[in-house]
Amino acid sequence: IKSVLRQDYDNWELIIVDDCSSSYEQLQKFVEDLNDPRVVYTHNAINSGACAVRNQAIMQAKGQYLTGIDDDDEWTPNRLSIFLSHKAQLVTHAFLYANDYVCQGEVYSQPASLPLYPKSPYSRRLFYKRNIIGNQVFTWAWRFKECLFDTELKAAQDYDIFLRMVVEYGCLLYT
């Protein structure tokens, strides 16, 4: 949450969907104490699962573009501004994606010892073999709203929606 608040681009909306966690009151108070109208909190009384929660947030979103962040993720301070500087590419690309980094304190790095860093540049052949993206992309909100995550899948839900987007809207772009 704090990494979203630190973005160098200010016009965003953060939708937090708490899927029936035992510590929801603590999170709810944290969000209330932020007193930031850009941060929207929703608590589910019944656990509905990751795909349903992502779909719930997607459908709540009011913005023109959409990207995601999971509770164990952190964004670099310029994540949104970098994606937005490449938004014209969405005319011919299904979505944009970027490298993962490891954060230690305030230092972001790409350690060579971790096999998933850096991510591979897009190639259709490689993409059809495995998920080279990870779990978060940036694209127009309407694309997410048309595709949505498949709540019936038990694994690879992110890869599934990305494949469907590529088939429907064109290749993807690594930024």
Walk through the language-model features, giving the residues of each.
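The conserved acidic donor/metal-binding loop of glycosyltransferases
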Residues: 70-74, 99
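Conserved donor sugar-nucleotide recognition element shared by glycan-biosynthetic enzymes
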Residues: 49-50, 54, 79, 132-135
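Conserved nucleotide-sugar donor-binding catalytic segment
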Residues: 116-174
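Short aromatic/hydrophobic "clamp" motif used to bind/position activated sugar donors
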Residues: 66
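Acidic donor-binding segment of Leloir-type glycosyltransferases
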Residues: 3-43
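Short alpha-helix within the catalytic core of nucleotide-sugar-dependent glycosyltransferases
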Residues: 1-2, 26-28, 55, 63, ...
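Glycine-rich, basic loop-to-helix element that forms the pyrophosphate-binding segment
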Residues: 44-61
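Conserved donor NDP-sugar-binding/catalytic core segment of glycosyltransferases
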Residues: 78-109
